[in-house]
């Protein structure tokens, strides 16, 4: 029996085709719980477009917004497992994993954009380390506008919140509500209108942005612009997926992330001003808390800060020291 052999021409052609065939482009999925109307989602989609453009299509990132692919609570575990390559979450929802994740929801610690940025720079090394232990890598973080209190009455005294069901999206906010005498209720952003209409929620602590996107004027009349804190969304990737990229593509991702962070902070500032105007134009009274209410909110926040320091230990001490040092250097 004759053994079949390949001709030299066939071998040469096969080798030529193998050499000429380009490497397959990488495709990532990025899961986000936020809808397309959110400036966060718009920024995330621009980040994805920037990556595609910078890599000439060698890496494409599909953003699945509004929880369309994965629910908020499952995004981080899914990225960790590699089910999806990237995700966006509300950072403080991880506070049950480490007190460090609560730092940007401590009332009175950072109530302005300048302070919030210093706090992010001070906390970023520790948060990056915590993510790395799970095979994850933060890309960038963007804050929501400062948090305030929505009610269907003029809020002049914290005693008015006693017994009310107050929407609180994370553990620290829930503790804050309890310190004020309210009953914390956890409700996803998309469910806010239904929660108010069914009586599951009487008031809520959130930003002017969320109030605008959720048409808060349909169920509340007042917004107390208390500048309690500026919580952040964090965008992160599966480290193995990132490591599989070549050096040029990795650099393109990091460069696009740096631009997204800078752009996102500016978008947040702009959205804060625009959202406040929208609320007022729709009949919501936007006002700063009076002196008595400010003191009551500060007292409730101080309790949280002291409790947080005791739970977070040395890491909290180091983080706050770095934060205060940055503030001192910049004369804040």
Where would I find each of the regions flagged by the language model?
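Bacterial N-terminal signal peptides that target proteins for export
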Residues: 1-9
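Sec/Tat signal peptide C-region and signal peptidase I cleavage site
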Residues: 19-25
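Hydrophobic helical h-region of N-terminal Sec-dependent signal peptides
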Residues: 10-17
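N-terminal secretory/targeting leader peptides
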Residues: 26-117, 123-332
